[in-house]
Amino acid sequence: MIFKETKLQGAFIIEPEMLIDERGAFARTFCCRDFENHGLNGNVSQCSISLNTKKNTLRGMHYQKKPYAEAKLVRCSRGFIYDVIVDLRYDSSTFKEWTSIEISAENRKMV
């Protein structure tokens, strides 16, 4: 997996490395060790899927305070997502900054 830093402290664009052969393709989408090597929480406590039945569906911001804070990994298995990240961590050097990325089934990016 290739981790690319965003302008936000601790937020990455993650691109899986595709292994392709005559059978098709394989890619790792999560590895605890890789996440921890980039300062991310590798302890997965939940995995969820969201299905939007209409185009242009808007979903809300997700926010948790300590001790309930969660690391998130967002990917798109069909269509595309315009994902916005806002840094609301008071102790962060990028507090109140934001960034966005288009994530799609085609580009395989995760954030």
Residue ranges of model-derived segments:
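Short, intrinsically disordered, charge-balanced linker/junction segments flanking boundaries
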Residues: 108-111
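Non-catalytic, conserved peripheral segments adjacent to functional cores
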Residues: 1-106
